[in-house]
């Protein structure tokens, strides 16, 4: 959600919004608004002074208050979900569908060409036969402000990339990268499953999608986009028939016994004794100047940001 929020609040000339509306008048529609992603998006937009939610679509909850589904919104608004999708009345529409459903929706429905689309699923994150901009503001801020179609990055992908991008940009990623990351249960979506029940998740930790998580595609894509031509290629091991020459991101995701947030550890080997100062990194969201050696998982819950801490060990 950081990426959406940052894109909307970027200053632009003549009092206009980077998404195409005017200050105090950006009209927004939301599809798939009853899920966890839709609920968090509604919370952010309700508190945004430049946004009006024109409709939030959910056929199964049409007529129900937002707070009937997203209880944390009780008292914040009296708006209801709708079955209608009046695209001609909005400047931008958010897709909060499950993965794979955005592309299918666009094949079956017509959205006016002047309406901007922000897709929160993974359908358009990988470059291909489309014009969607990958919505990581630390590297694509100007493109985001100008684009018509935006693909919001994945949760793991955002966390992992922001730690690695300064090193990639400096050409320092020359060895395989080890990543371990723990995610909360809401990352699995609202629909209950065997691995999301409290009785299974509480006081438990488990590995899933070992070295095969789908976010590897977008991580490798961005690292290769930023690295100098002389730096090793980052191999996307999920691609069929990939060539092994280059370096890999060895990513092990874990299910944690908490609801929200991601805690990530990235281990890289640097051939040069070089440290990247926060000011040298892509336009990011700061460092941790208080001297703490580790961020806390609870620190970032409900916030549009993250902590990055760099620890290093010198081998002689």
Q: What do these predicted ranges mean?
A:
Residues 2-11, 25-210, 229-231, 242-244:
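N-terminal Rossmann-like NAD(P) cofactor-binding subdomain of oxidoreductases
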Residues 11, 236, 280, 287-292, ...:
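Intrinsic-disorder-associated, low-complexity terminal segments enriched in Asp/Asn/His/Tyr and depleted
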Residues 16-17, 279-281, 294:
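Serine residues within intrinsically disordered or low-complexity segments
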Residues 187-234, 239-273, 303-316:
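Charged docking surfaces used in two-component/phosphorelay signaling
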Residues 6-9, 19, 227, 234, ...:
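Low-complexity intrinsically disordered segments
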Residues 14, 118, 290:
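Residue-level hotspots at or immediately adjacent to binding/recognition sites across diverse folds
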Residues 20-24, 240-241, 284-286, 297-301:
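Glycine-biased, low-complexity coil/linker segments
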């Amino acid at each position: 959600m950081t990426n959406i929020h940052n894109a909307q609040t970027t200053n632009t000339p003549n009092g206009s919004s980077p998404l195409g509306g005017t200050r105090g008048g950006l009209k927004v529609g939301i599809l798939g608004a009853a899920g966890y992603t839709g609920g968090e998006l509604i919370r952010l937009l309700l508190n945004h002074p430049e946004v009006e939610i024109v409709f939030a679509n959910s056929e199964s909850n049409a007529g129900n208050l937002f707070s009937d589904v997203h209880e944390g919104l009780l008292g914040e608004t009296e708006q209801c979900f709708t079955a209608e999708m009046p695209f001609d009345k909005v400047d931008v529409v958010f897709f909060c569908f499950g993965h794979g459903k955005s592309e299918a929706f666009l094949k079956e429905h017509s959205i006016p060409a002047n309406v901007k689309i922000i897709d929160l699923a993974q359908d358009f994150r990988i470059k291909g036969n489309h014009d969607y901009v990958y919505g990581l503001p630390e590297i694509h801020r100007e493109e985001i402000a100008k684009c018509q179609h935006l693909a919001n990055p994945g949760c793991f992908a955002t966390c992992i990339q922001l730690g690695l991008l300064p090193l990639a940009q400096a050409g320092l990623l020359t060895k395989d990268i080890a990543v371990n990351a723990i995610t909360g249960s809401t990352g699995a979506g609202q629909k209950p499953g065997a691995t999301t029940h409290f009785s299974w998740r509480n006081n438990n930790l488990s590995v899933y999608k070992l070295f095969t998580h789908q976010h590897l595609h977008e991580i490798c894509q961005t690292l290769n986009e930023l690295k100098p031509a002389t730096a090793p290629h980052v191999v996307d091991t999920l691609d069929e028939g990939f060539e092994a020459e280059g370096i890999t991101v060895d990513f092990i995701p874990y299910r944690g016994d908490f609801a929200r947030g991601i805690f990530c550890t990235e281990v890289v080997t640097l051939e040069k004794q070089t440290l990247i100062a926060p000011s040298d990194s892509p336009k990011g969201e700061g460092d941790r100047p208080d001297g703490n050696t580790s961020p806390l998982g609870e620190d970032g819950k409900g916030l549009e940001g993250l902590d990055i801490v760099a620890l290093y060990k010198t081998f002689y």
